[in-house]
Amino acid sequence: MSKKRSVAKENSSDDTDTIISPANDTAENGAAMSIAIVGMGCRYPGQADSADSFWQILTDGVDATSPIPADRWNNDRLSSPDPANEPGSLRAERMGMVHDIADFDAGFFGISPREAAVMDPQQRIILETAYDALENAGQTLETWGGQDVGVFVGAASTDYMSAQLIYRDGINGYTNSGSALSIIANRISYQFDFKGPSLVVDTACSSSLTALDLACRSVSSGDCQMALVGGAVSYTHLTLPTNREV
């Protein structure tokens, strides 16, 4: 990852991200502007780290779930056939797991190890997939840095923030920004020097679709020249799943 990104940055100068841009100018008769999807990046269970590998999983009918590893939680202690009547337990033997969720090339993005340590995985992964989407689109930060590029992200999970409050040893001056949902989008805009609208929207399961709708409206209205649209959700801790069949 580091080598690939370093080469891309040198030669040309992130969870799912999609880049959309106007396919043509608004017609003189007032017809709606066409919108084109020009690049994509993603991270999904089953080690799908690109649109091509994700599509391969779908076409091959691959089961992308896997047994719950011990480094996530002790499932033998927490598992129950009747979680509704056993507080603090859950029924789950397998999970859709994004591998290497703790890995992050902080130095590539100019982020200090101290700050990276308290960044929500949603922030880290979507920053990487945003960069991947730009590469996939054949776009460079030299071209779009400082331009009116919008960033619209759908996100709703705050379990990493909850974990920070429970396990307080790692809290530092970056914890607030590192766990805030709004920063998922704002960090991309800051790191890439994008000057367009930058926001996170939470409409539960429709968050990403709502973000896409807002991005299309923003591009069509001229609020931004191009938009990066994404969605992020990760559950790193058991506050939400416990007492539920998952």
Positions of PLM-derived features:
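Cys-dependent condensing catalytic cores that perform Claisen condensation/acyl-transfer
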Residues: 2-5, 20-238, 244
